[in-house]
Amino acid sequence: EAVRSSTEAMGWETVNAVKTPLTQTDFSSYIAPVLQSDADVLVLNHYGGNMVNSLTNAVQFGLRDKLVNNKNFEIVVPLYSRLMAKGAGANVKGIFGSTNWHWSLQDEGSKAFVKSFGTKYGFPPSQAAHTTYVQTLLYADACERAGTFNPCGVVEALEGFEFDGMGNGKTLYRAEDHQCFKDVLVVKGKENPTSEFDLLEIVEVTPVGQVTYAPDHPQVAGGSLGTCNPGA
C-alpha cells in the first residue's frame, strides 16, 4: 500500500499488485504475467532470499532487457542489503533500489568507520555492520547524557535527538513514534563490480524532507508507544 500510494501520488498507474507466499522459492508463475502487461516498472517488494529468487526469475524472463513504449523496463528493489545483492549476483546489474548507508560515502564519520573496520576484518563494512556500530554509539551516548542505564532515562535522551557524523547527513529520532529520519541513498547494481563488496553504486541522495511522513499518517497511525517500563 505504501508503494502504491507513493507512486500514484506522482502520477504513476498501478497495473497490478500481487502478493506472494513467504515460503515461495520459485516466482516464475508470478513474473510471467508481467511480460504480457503494459507495465514498464516492476517493484519487487521482497527481502532476503525472496528478493534473491524473485529478482533472479525476473532477469531470467528477460524483464531487465525489455522495452515498453521505447523505454527501458525497470526493476526496483525497495531496500538492498549486501547479502541480498551478493546472493543475486550478476542479476543486480542495473537494478535500482535504496540503502541506509554505503561504505563509499566520503563524510568523515563514514571514512573513519570504513578504515577501522577494514583494518580489523580486511574488507569494507556492510550496511548491517554500520547500523550496529551507530546504534552502539547512540546507546552509549544516551546513557552518558542521561546519567543512567535506566531504560526510561535512555529513552528520554533519545527522543527528539538529532545527530550527525554517521553518514547520510543529519539524522533525527522522532519523539512521537521513535522513527529515524535521514537522507536516503538511491543505489543501482554496478555493471562492472571490482569485488564482491563493490556490487552497488550510489546514483542519487533523496533529501530527508522527501521521505519524512507525519506521525499520524493513515498508514502508520493508530498505535501507541505506551508508558515506559524500566524493567523493574
Language model feature labels by segment:
Residues 1-232:
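Extracytosolic ligand-binding ectodomains
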